[in-house]
Amino acid sequence: MLQVYLVRHGETEWNVARRIQGQSDSPLTAMGVRQAQQVAERVKSAGITHIISSDLGRTCQTAEIIAQACRCDVITDPRLRELDMGVLEQREIATLNTQEEAWRKSLIDGTPDGRIPQGESMVELANRMQAALNSCLALPEHSRPLLVSHGIALGCLLSTVLGLPAYAERRLRLRNCSISRVDYQNSPWLANGWVIETAGDVSHLTDIALDEVQR
């Protein structure tokens, strides 16, 4: 059985400012660094053999902290990037007009082929995330990889593992530096292939989550 850990990056300056990041970038806050350190402490004894990260700065920064504890190098894979949010990237959510907010909402409300102009659809996102996950099957036997990616990207991936359409309503909260795990197995009581073992675990984090403060 192959176990793959999935980690969202730590809190960023733009998370705090409620700016749309997408494939643009923002550095981790001090809390984000602390969150990554707590992930590292949690997984350092889990037998992680590979750290594979989105090539965006916030994920690489998170991955490097985890990799030091696990004594692994960081491998980057652009397929693990966040959803491309097109013309709305770098915008503060509070500044969006009615049309722009409708574009943003179409990504999370179940709209088939919802997208922001010049951005990706959830189906396009799911296709590359699934390809990145499936590439773990080619790793040497007994590998235990950890992938560092993004909130919408990981939520979409987990939804499709459950058999939901990529554009299904977004109902899974994956907080900064949450840990999920998917296993590839043949089981008499589960569908063969990828199954979800855990999703959105934050028991290793000590600070109040940003989305608890910003309700």
UniProtKB/Swiss-Prot annotation:
CDD domains the UniProt entry points to: HP_PGM_like
First-level EC class: isomerase
CC terms in the record's Gene Ontology section: cytoplasm
Pathway: Carbohydrate degradation; glycolysis; pyruvate from D-glyceraldehyde 3-phosphate: step 3/5
Keywords carried by this UniProt record: Glycolysis, Isomerase
Gene Ontology terms for molecular function: phosphatase activity; phosphoglycerate mutase activity
Site (Transition state stabilizer) location in chain: H150
GO BP: glycolytic process
EC number: 5.4.2.-
One family name in Pfam for this protein: His_Phos_1
PROSITE patterns: PG_MUTASE
Catalytic activity: (2R)-2-phosphoglycerate = (2R)-3-phosphoglycerate
Positions annotated to bind substrate: 8-15, 21-22, 58, 82-85, 151-152
InterPro entries membership: His_Pase_superF_clade-1, His_PPase_superfam, PG/BPGM_mutase_AS, PGM_Phosphatase, Phosphoglycerate_mutase_GpmB
Superkingdom of this protein's organism: Bacteria
Active site (catalytic residues): H9, E82
NCBIfam families to which the protein is assigned, alphabetical: PRK03482.1 (NF002901)
Family: Belongs to the phosphoglycerate mutase family. GpmB subfamily.
PANTHER family registered for this protein in UniProt: BROAD-SPECIFICITY PHOSPHATASE YOR283W-RELATED (PTHR48100), HISTIDINE PHOSPHATASE FAMILY PROTEIN-RELATED (PTHR48100:SF1)
UniProt-recorded name of the protein: Probable phosphoglycerate mutase GpmB
Natural source organism: Proteus mirabilis (strain HI4320)
Organism lineage string: Bacteria, Pseudomonadati, Pseudomonadota, Gammaproteobacteria, Enterobacterales
